[in-house]
Amino acid sequence: MSSVYKTKNLQGHERPIKQLKFSKDGKYIFSASADRKVIKWNYKNNSKDSVYMHNASVNVICLSNSNKYMLSGDGAGLIYVWDINTNENIKKITFDKLYNITSLNVSSDDTYFIMTCSERGKQNSFIAIYLLEDIIKIEKEEIKTETENKLQVPSEMKKNIKTEKAPNVFKQINCTKENTKFIKSCFTNMNKSILISREDGILEMYDFTNDTLISSEKFHTSEILDFDVNYENGIIITSSKDGEMSLINLNTFKLMNKFKPINPVRLLNSCQIAVIDNPYYVVPGMKSEISIDTLFDLNTMDITKLRYFENESDKEKAQKFKNKKQIVLACVGGGQDSKFVTTTQQKEGGFEIIIYNVFTGEKLAEFLDHFGPVNTLAVYKDIICSGGEDSSVKVHDIKHYLFS
């Protein structure tokens, strides 16, 4: 692995980063922070496109698959609805009780909006599912396009922003187990099922259509902080407070592998699956024309452009990956609990981002780019974005880490 890597630093937050999301087309990154802001970044030129203001720490965000709406949940238990194409705050949603909102997601067909939360100061937690159209609908005359409603203006200064009670719940799933809470949920299997992580290290699959629990397995000894699903390869990865990452078969719900990146135990706050094209792939049937020294340039698909390797390290990488057209990666980040960060050396805090080959378990890259825990990761193709307790947002080229 090379000690030189490619990183972009996006500067604009003053407090810890809570969550990152790519737009569905990969053009923008959205970063939610404890400084009450969500920033929409055009990361290719390191510029801010818009700033979305709350009155409290913004802890969770999600984007509709139509690339039109963003929903953001804050520490005051409010959800704001934004039109990310016009940069307008459509409305904010309040609830009858004060909730800790721990995850927001939208179904792949944009039919449903799913929220994981617990009542403030109480143990009970639940998952509330709404029709997305009920969440975003608003009377046309209440949508303003004036300059005063652009998102660079703090929300408390805006006029005519509709505040309303949450619509009727379409379906609710309650956590019936004692001494545990739901942490995160999302739709899976063509929106027929819901994947749920819990505080006690259990991952559950719930049948959304028939309202029955399909599977419930304990994959960790402590809270599952994050998970990600890859449907093409039929896998789930989970990261936990116990310092381990699990690889799970989506279809059988059985454990395939365990990864323990850091010893002693550090919190693994976030995990993501990345599937990248392999620049060392040897096209079948072309071995007579192409040897390990002259590989086909997969990026340009031009037979006249051959890749020549200058050293033995490149040859070893080519040999390792040449039979795989795509490489499936597990990316994980975390670190020591933030309350201990000020007394810990950077290298001792476990603040590295680690990339594994999902199926072999081999560590392919490890890099340190934050001065504190990595709180959140987001992946789009071969780009990985990380947000830290140090308030920084970093954009990394995965191929540069793996192949340069």
Feature locations, PLM:
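WD40/WD-repeat beta-propeller blade N-cap
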Residues: L10-I17, Y52-V58, T94-I101, N174-F182, ...
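Hydrophobic core register within WD40 beta-propeller blades
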Residues: L20, I61, L104, S185, ...
